[in-house]
């Protein structure tokens, strides 16, 4: 198993949830965390613990982004008008690597990030290798010519376990348009996300 896939499943085990809804996730077979102490009964979690877990789960879902990047997303969300938790989700869903994942150009968020960093993704026809770039409504995201025949891209497009959400409009198999910034209810999370607890965590 590659380091990337091992890390992906480690996040699932750490959270105790199949956060991407993958059929091969080890938490489908067991309900305890990673490591030699994973089978111990979990004690009641404090409010701080719940907030921390909510942050780690959301952060992990978006490819285990760095704390610096995640905190910047929160800070930007808190400066916008409206509900900070909704703003945070909107900012995270605008990440280029997430749009590549939502478009089913890649089977995992990690593979999506790799496609971007290797220069296989175009934004409005221009190559972009910055996974954290925030896409705007109306932007077109497309696969480069070499990527269109990649095995991992073809694998992703055949996956039946997830659909392309309404806020990402496909144009054939190689291009999508980011239609609008979604609300929390629109995002197809396989597990419950609690961005309100993330806001509480950073507001302490």
From Swiss-Prot:
Matches recorded under InterPro entries: Ribosomal_uS4 (IPR022801), Ribosomal_uS4_bac-type (IPR005709), Ribosomal_uS4_CS (IPR018079), Ribosomal_uS4_N (IPR001912), S4_RNA-bd (IPR002942), S4_RNA-bd_sf (IPR036986)
Keywords, sorted A to Z: Ribonucleoprotein, Ribosomal protein, RNA-binding, rRNA-binding
Gene Ontology terms for molecular function: rRNA binding; structural constituent of ribosome
Domain S4 RNA-binding residues, every copy: 94-157
One Pfam family of this chain: Ribosomal_S4
Region (Disordered): 1-46
UniProt record, GO biological process: ribosomal small subunit biogenesis; translation
One Gene Ontology cellular component: small ribosomal subunit
Subunit structure: Part of the 30S ribosomal subunit. Contacts protein S5. The interaction surface between S4 and S5 is involved in control of translational fidelity.
Role: One of the primary rRNA binding proteins, it binds directly to 16S rRNA where it nucleates assembly of the body of the 30S subunit.
Family membership: Belongs to the universal ribosomal protein uS4 family.
Listed name of the protein: Small ribosomal subunit protein uS4
Organism: Zymomonas mobilis subsp. mobilis (strain ATCC 31821 / ZM4 / CP4)
Gene name in the database record: rpsD
């Amino acid at each position: 198993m590659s380091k990337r896939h091992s890390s992906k499943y480690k996040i699932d085990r750490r959270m105790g949830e199949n956060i991407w809804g993958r059929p091969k996730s080890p938490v489908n077979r067991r309900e305890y965390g990673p490591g030699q102490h994973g089978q111990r009964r979990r004690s009641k979690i404090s409010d701080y613990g719940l907030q921390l877990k909510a942050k780690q789960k959301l952060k992990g879902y978006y490819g285990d982004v760095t704390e610096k990047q995640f905190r910047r997303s929160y800070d930007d969300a808190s400066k916008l008008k409206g509900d900070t938790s909704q703003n945070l989700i909107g900012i995270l869903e605008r990440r280029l690597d997430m749009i590549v994942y939502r478009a089913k150009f890649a089977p995992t968020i990690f593979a999506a990030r790799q496609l971007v960093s290797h220069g296989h993704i175009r934004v409005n026809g221009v190559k972009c290798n910055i996974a954290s770039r925030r896409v705007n409504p109306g932007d077109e995201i497309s696969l480069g010519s070499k990527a269109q025949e990649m095995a991992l891209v073809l694998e992703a497009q055949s996956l039946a376990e997830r659909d392309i959400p309404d806020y990402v409009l496909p144009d054939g198999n190689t291009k999508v348009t980011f239609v609008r910034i979604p609300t929390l209810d629109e995002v197809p999370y396989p597990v419950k996300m609690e961005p309100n607890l993330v806001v509480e965590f950073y507001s302490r």
